[in-house]
């Protein structure tokens, strides 16, 4: 579905990614793990065209995306949930969710997808009239993911969904990712909580200093000695 081949990218004179290649197949949950500053967020920003790659090829299904502007990426079925969520704090939960269905094809299925989001996040149904800015951190993350799902994406990009959340809330967020995987959603998730994300992912890539250092089945990486020592505290 998604294929990156030899992607390099950066900001100004700083290069953040070096010759990165990865794939996400339909129905997979794929994790990108690594330390702070490894280039994980930059990778998602390249995919959603918030920044341009300086080298390499980016493709979604049969479409080359290198020259596609950022506002058009949603038309190719890619939805991005950024690390800071970027909700509209003075709008209600349901109004925020409605913002995710702004493209014509999504507007036509608003009611159906709203019910799907409420089924996935029952708390959002309870809070639907509440201002998004008054939600807890975990509830805001659920709302942000729900808003992205309202577009009916083929691929969901999640940037550090557990960042800044209490452990019990982190578990709830990963339970949602697990449910999305079971329901056939395709997810590319960037995450520093390696122990949790390798439990829900099918495959994973280790990104360090802007380069892919390891890749494989998530279950295999959980048993990798270097991963255990550096990221799992074992």
Describe each region flagged by the PLM.
Residues 33-35:
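The feature captures the beta-strand-to-loop junction immediately N-terminal to the Walker
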Residues 12, 68, 93-112, 120-125, ...:
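ABC-type ATPase nucleotide-binding domains, specifically the catalytic core motifs of the NBD
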Residues 48:
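Helix-to-loop junction immediately C-terminal to a conserved catalytic motif
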Residues 131-135, 139:
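Conserved ABC ATPase signature
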